[in-house]
Amino acid sequence: MKLICEFDRAQYLTGQEVRLSLPEGVNAPRVCVYRLETPVDCSVRQSGRTLILPPLPIGSYGVAVEAGSAQWEGAFDVVEDSRQVTRYAFLSDFTSADTETQDVDWLRRLHFNAVQFYDWMYRHDMLLPPQERYLDPMGRETDLAAIRAKIAACKAAGIRPIAYGAVYAAAKELFAEHPEWAMYTMDGQAMTFAGWLYYMNIAPSCGWSEHILAEFRKAVAFGFSGIHMDTYGFPKQVWDAERRPVELTDALPKLIDRAAEAVRTEDPAAGVIFNAVNNWPMEAVAETRQDAVYIEVWPPNDRYYDLYTLIREARLCSGKQVVLAAYLHPFQQADTDGAERAFRLSWAAISAA
């Protein structure tokens, strides 16, 4: 018999029981809970095909289950607040055919406790759609029913569903309505990303910042547990509609803190995570009220040592957990053995930090 157990949650909060599912036919298995190498004295009971551990103190634990000659080992953690420990993943398929939640089940088994819903929105400047089914900004079919199902599955599994939200991107229509909200070059040209998204001025004095914060609040009111505040890494020097320079290193920390406050008016447990693309502007945003430090890695940070350094410096600046979006070359386009070795080396460098 092959013994495979599953935790019912990706992470546990203090006061919650820890539940493990058992294969059919397994009765009264031997169970040992560890903290590092030390056994933890706790009473374990079985109810049907479920092992139930009592609420445990904050910490990380291992558990071994034996039934006859078969053995299974796993691990789990207990935290006071899920924002204290972040293991980050993402989902990107929300069509009418994607209302099932096997993807969330898989993330639960991997212990991811925060999941970004990437490109779920109707528009960059209007996150929630006017109808249930819609086309996202890239023209892909999207269904709110699928999003609702995955949000509910995440919350039931101890996973925080995080809504993607770009901090300064707007469609041409909104730019035409509010050109005074845009960011400009020094010679007065409106700045665009990929030729179709307009950069908006995030300074507190600009109406755009109130607009996007209201959109973030709506997303949390819809059911999300926070916002992934995305940036594109550039530009770094911009001007407003009156040809005045806008200091993004000053404006971004203020926006992050205002966003954290805004989403918590809808849900006190909600939070924000800001994408400091290629570690910019790390020193400015490190001490903001974001839940974790998130760095999307691009050249010239393309060596293993760079991954190590990014994490060490970000942790030193912020005292928070660090999430790296470090993109490996797709395995389909590379030698499989070489790609796996590259992954293992990357993981070793990250773990060493």
Which residues are covered by each model-predicted region?
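Aromatic- and acidic-residue-enriched carbohydrate-binding clefts of CAZyme catalytic domains
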Residues: 121-147, 174-203, 233-250
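Short, acidic/polar
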Residues: 94-109, 208-220, 276-284, 339-347
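Extended acidic/polar, glycine-enriched regions
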Residues: 40-84
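An acidic-aromatic substrate-binding cleft motif
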Residues: 72-123
